[in-house]
Curated annotation (Swiss-Prot):
Secretion signal span: 1-18
Gene: dpp11
Species this chain originates from: Shewanella putrefaciens (strain CN-32 / ATCC BAA-453)
Biological processes per GO annotation: peptide catabolic process; proteolysis
The name this protein goes by in its record: Asp/Glu-specific dipeptidyl-peptidase
Record-annotated membrane-spanning stretches: none
Active site per database record: 80, 215, 666
Amino acid sequence: MRIALVATLVLTSGIANADEGQWQPYQMPSIADKLSERGIDIPAEKLADLTSYPMNAVVGLGYCTASFVSPQGLVVTNHHCAYKAIQYNTKQEHNYLEQGFLATSMDKEPSAGPNERLYITEAVTDVTKDVTKELSQDPLTRYEEIQNNSKALIKNCEVDDNYRCNVRSFHNGLEYYLIKQLMIRDVRLVYAPPESVGGYGGDIDNYEYPRHSGDFAFLRAYVGKDGKPAAYAEDNIPYKPKSYLKVNADGVKAGDGVFVAGYPGTTSRYNLTSELKFASDWLYPTQAKRYQLQIDTINAMGQEDADIAIKYAGNMASMANRMKKLNGLLAGFKATDIIGIKQSREDNFLAWLKQNPKLNQNLIAELEVLLAEQQQVFQSNYYFTNAQSSTLLTAANSLYRLAKEKQKSDAEREIGYQERDLAMFSSRLKRIDSSFHVDVDKTLWQQDLRAYLAQPNRIAALDDALDLNNKETNLEAKLDGLYSLTTLTDQAQRLAWMDADTTTFETSTDPFIRLAVALYDTNMAQEKAEKILDGKLSTARPDYMAAVIEYYKANNWPVYPDANGTLRISYGMVDGYQSRDALYKQPFTRLDGIVAKHTGAEPYNAPQKLLDAISEQRFGDHLVKSVYQDPRGWICRLFSCLDKPEEFNSVPVNFLSSVDTTGGNSGSPVFNGKGELVGLNFDSTYEAITKDWFFNPTITRAVHVDIRYILWMMDKVDHADNLIKELDLVRN
């Protein structure tokens, strides 16, 4: 182990537990001392203020995170987050996935796609009392009242089409917050390196370390000439954000405090052990089996047809990522006995509960009954749900549901089918063409139907509609007939169905429309049963969470909500880790590692211009002499250090930190202690995958693209001089 890191390692071991938490911004003042311990000097009150720097420069993509980095609406995120935008503009004659893309001027920036959005969170308001006031004890009525109260709040919040508001549940329904976001509807592609840079190492390196991935890309936000959000138009102008991030060209060193801000998707840290067992024993293995079959199928078909390979590139990347995460979760459950750890903590909670007789002693028992029912319902519906996986059937189901919902007043409609939702509804129908191929869709659907036929939970409506009980039925021929007779493969026809009434649907001869009509009552009955169960859980889960929070506080453990796709902040330090016996992983990787991994074949096929820049040592002022702390600093007055920090003499490519992240944090800006951009979050280590269920500070590490690699790529490899000029570059 490097002597230069001894001090850092000692420091880490002392306060590692402090790094846990995906905190709501308003909570930051309560952990100000923790931030200070990490060397994060930006005032905690500033991080709680969504209207000022740096928080108002952090934006959501709906599935990833990004940030403004110029006064002209330039946005930086991960390459894999911009993947569908790159794919949308990729054709066989100009394959931007393979070749990369750089717009040398704003007039050359193409649309990222009809349903790409940027969301800027402007306000987060506690509306718990408004959502939960005077709720019925009847489960279905209770569920509907929560929904209706939420819809009323959303309607009052969305003062015009420029804003998107949502009510989100926190702590499993114990709290509710109204999220108000400015929505940018014209997003354009600006710059993306080739996939052989942005995804260097591919699925082999995914969730692994050391990494050498240039997982970055640039988009731009556009608005109408009046400065307000507008749909795509050629004469739209760049959006001028209220703030944009300072970019620190000197980056960070080992031991430096860092924090990330972003939109983490889902974690399950407060869930019961029985839920973890269900995921481990049935859900994850079942999902992994299906993903693997789909990946193998699309990969084989893509090798025969370049159009398929391009259209399904985004889906393949997403499925491969999910597949590796599932396998990592399953391996991690066995390697670290997380089930045992969770059960032990649950047992301790029950013991504490007995010492607090004023609290409901049956909290877990009551919740377990409902969870068992929920798992049974999920299992029984799983194969029927997948049996409707055809893209065209999914569209038909949604379109018929829209016609049904339009029979109600807008306030009574389900979320997703209100007037506020129709623009995005239309965009999704348009976007189908960019990631759809009849042969692939039909093959995947046939696989799901065969899996459905092989299990006992059969649905009469589906069996009758497709004649599945008839042993003489040739499933392949049956599906060929459906696809050959439908008009839903045509975008104009799909969009026209948005204006059709229920009678038009019910008298249609289109086979997918007819199938959607036939399945509607069954789908609605299942949805109603799920709502009733959700209504029951909306009482049991908050009661459980209230007691758990009290228990956590009694133990002086961090209390923060599970991730739910809303804006959060996590902090930590730049740090390596002991991945297994005698194997310590250093916090930084170098350009040399790209060359060492290069084979010329995917996924280690670095572009020649990148290899040339490395071999010719065209580093410029991006060369970093050392990524370790100066031994003359205070830390080395306490510990024995080398006379000089160990030499690095390269450009840092990726680095590790102990920040707490999960899916959705991809693209999150990584800040130094001053609140300046020093990298982008893009992955986690394989050992850390199980952090969605249980946070282990010893091995939990996030993987980031170093800003110095991004700037070097822009400067010395791709010559994105026009973009470099836009950035507000600072140095230490």
